[in-house]
Amino acid sequence: MLDGLTYDDSESPSIALVPPGTSWEQVHDHIKIAHDFLLVQPVGSGYAGAYWTGTQMVVLEELGADQDEALDEFREQLGQRGEL
């Protein structure tokens, strides 16, 4: 489990902000247990969103380089996919 996550709950759903340097393996281990929506910033890349479908982790890449923009885009894509 990832410790010390901060959450953006300015809109629904609440999305956890993953600290820089967190590996995808750590993200997978956390999301498999907690089923949070996670915003991840991989090294050298824009933000990606990750969520658990019940059987696997899904990663939505290229949500933007700006955190606020990425949060908005992640929420929009979750809604379009029927995950909300």
PLM segments and residue spans:
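Short intrinsically disordered terminal tails
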Residues: M1-L5, L78-L84
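Small side chains
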Residues: G4, A16, G46-A50, G64, ...
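Intrinsically disordered, low-complexity coil/linker segments enriched for acidic/polar
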Residues: S23, H28, S45, G64-D66
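Short glycine-rich, low-complexity/disordered patches
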Residues: D8, L39-G44, E83-L84
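A short, exposed loop/beta-hairpin motif centered on an aromatic-Gly-Thr core
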Residues: I15-P19, Q56-Q67
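Negatively charged, low-complexity tracts enriched in Asp/Glu with abundant Ser/Thr
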Residues: M1-A34
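Short aromatic-glycine-(Arg/Gly/Cys) micro-motifs in beta-strand/loop hairpins
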Residues: V40-V59
